Amino acid sequence: MRTSHGMQHLEWAGQFGNDYAKRSPGDVQANEVFFARILAAMNADPISAIEFGCGVGNNLRALRTLLPDIALRGVEINESAAILARQVTPLITIGSMLVHEAIISWELAFTKGVLIHIPPVDLPRAYEVLYRASRKYIMVAEYYAPKPTEIEYRGRRDMLWKGPHAYDMLDRYQDLKLLDYGFVSSRDPYPQDDLNWWILEKRP
């Protein structure tokens, strides 16, 4: 297994990522139902949020619908997807989350189906970025496995790993506490991928 994110960076920034963006209109209502559930688990609605790997902006759009006044920012590696995401908020940075430097913090920092595409060796950097970008909440919605487990993705290797992402972060950062967690199913009335989600909260 290659241990650098370089190959993945090139794939997601290039045609592979362009193709993904074309497949990503998504079910708007299902996304709104998902994020309504996430927000309900928080002690208060966040006033700002940053998404790493925001794609075409589906998740940011759902948050904007539910919280019209929320300040939003996204980081997206694929330029074609980022251009579409700017229809939701102009604050979209083109680049990998692994090189993102948090200048300001946001009440909510999150990923949804993104950490699974980062090689396990690079996850500590991704966790650090999420942690530093968050002022209060971190949400991860990813494919879970007790340890990093590679899965073939669209006929490709070195592109997807299930893992214990939230647990890794809880072990790494002692001021993070598990606020809530759950599962969404592809067979729900408002279906998503079969994803586990966790909400972590920074506490003194």
Please name every model-derived segment.
Residues 116-118:
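A short His-aromatic
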Residues 113:
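Nucleotide-sugar donor-binding/catalytic module of glycosyltransferases
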Residues 1-104, 121-132, 136-204:
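Class I (Rossmann-like) S-adenosyl-L-methionine-dependent methyltransferase catalytic domain
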Residues 107:
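Conserved active-site beta-strand-loop modules that form the wall/rim of enzyme catalytic pockets
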Residues 110:
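A conserved beta-strand element that flanks and buttresses the S-adenosyl-L-methionine
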